[in-house]
Amino acid sequence: MERITVTLGERSYPITIAAGLFNEPASFLPLKSGDQVMLVTNETLAPLYLDKVRGVLERAGVNVDSVILPDGEQYKSLTVLDTVFTALLKKPHGRDTTLVALGGGVIGDLTGFAAASYQRGVRFIQVPTTLLSQVDSSVGGKTAVNHPLGKNMIGAFYQPASVVVDLDCLKTLPARELASGLAEVIKYGIILDADFFTWLEGNLDALLRLDGPAMAYCIRRCCELKAEVVAADEREAGLRALLNLGHTFGHAIEAEMGYGNWLHGEAVAAGIVMAARASERLGQFSSTDTQRIIALLERAGLPVNGPCEMSAQDYLPHMLRDKKVLAGELRLVLPLAIGKSEVRGGVSHEVVLSAIADCQQA
């Protein structure tokens, strides 16, 4: 069992990583006998895990209710968020309740925002079931729902009480979802850790076949990197923005193509290559390193080009709504070398459009 702490003073919390955690009541810190819980999951995961998690909590004396939501990025919305509030109010659940997010990034983000909002804030626990949510979205307290005009535009910074990563969940993950998570894994190597990127080049095949020790190390390293960044810059005033490599381009793809048609990691993968091409055009990044990135993404089964249905011009309206925009100026996360990156303002639209055009599908 691995345990990492996200250090935020009185709001610090553990990330527990191991196989078989759903069998252990002690995994679900800080729940105790007599607590009230609302389990939030989706229609795909409920048959797989809901009864198992409910059972282990009830055997520990926890009072458990549940709400099952539709599955998909398109349901990460205010309308579906209201379903959670209604379920909480009907029981009813008070300020001493705990929401448990049992699912991937959509469930985690939506449940976290529900917890931040319900009766001005209640406790919640992240139980991520996808690789993407285990290495990224469950850690750090970013919670949100989407708006038709932009991804994650309505939300709050709100930290969980704990994160429970059961490696066994990856056994039921579709191959496309596994690849989507690997985009975020590869991102960490590009922006923060050249040695980890090199390790990924040598161990990607092991990750694709869900090798236990390799996957445990991979998730632990990603969580360590994320925890260090969040501890230093919880509200994304500087360093934390680096975690958005590829996301400004990727969010444009998700919004333009319709949420759910491109998985988040797929869009981020294409966006990472666009960011690398932009950095190349600015003389900040080598074409050799871009090719290393492309090769690793392709081995992971990820796209390295944007959708053929989008022109370069289609990206800009979405990118100009990005949360990093200041005074109407685009700010992009750009790689400088494998393991090093920066947030750069003043990147011209010409450079951005050229980088996108370099990465458009024929």
UniProtKB/Swiss-Prot annotation:
One of its GO terms (biological process) is amino acid biosynthetic process. It is found in: Cytoplasm. It catalyses: 7-phospho-2-dehydro-3-deoxy-D-arabino-heptonate = 3-dehydroquinate + phosphate. The keyword Transmembrane helix does not apply. NAD(+) binds at residues 71-76, 105-109, 129-130, 142, 151, 169-172. Zn(2+) binds at E184, H247, H264. GO terms for cellular component: cytoplasm. It comes from the Bacteria. SUPFAM superfamilies: Dehydroquinate synthase-like. It is an enzyme of class 4 (lyase). One of its GO terms (molecular function) is 3-dehydroquinate synthase activity. Pathway: Metabolic intermediate biosynthesis; chorismate biosynthesis; chorismate from D-erythrose 4-phosphate and phosphoenolpyruvate: step 2/7. Gene3D superfamilies: 3.40.50.1970, Dehydroquinate synthase-like - alpha domain. Its cofactor is Co(2+); Zn(2+); NAD(+). Its EC number is 4.2.3.4. Binds 1 divalent metal cation per subunit. Can use either Co(2+) or Zn(2+). InterPro entries: Dehydroquinate_synthase (IPR050071), DHQ_synth_AroB (IPR016037), DHQ_synth_fam (IPR030963), DHQS/DOIS_N (IPR030960), DHQS_C (IPR056179). Keywords: Amino-acid biosynthesis, Aromatic amino acid biosynthesis, Cobalt, Cytoplasm, Lyase, Metal-binding, NAD, Nucleotide-binding, Zinc. Catalyzes the conversion of 3-deoxy-D-arabino-heptulosonate 7-phosphate (DAHP) to dehydroquinate (DHQ). Belongs to the sugar phosphate cyclases superfamily. Dehydroquinate synthase family. This is 3-dehydroquinate synthase.
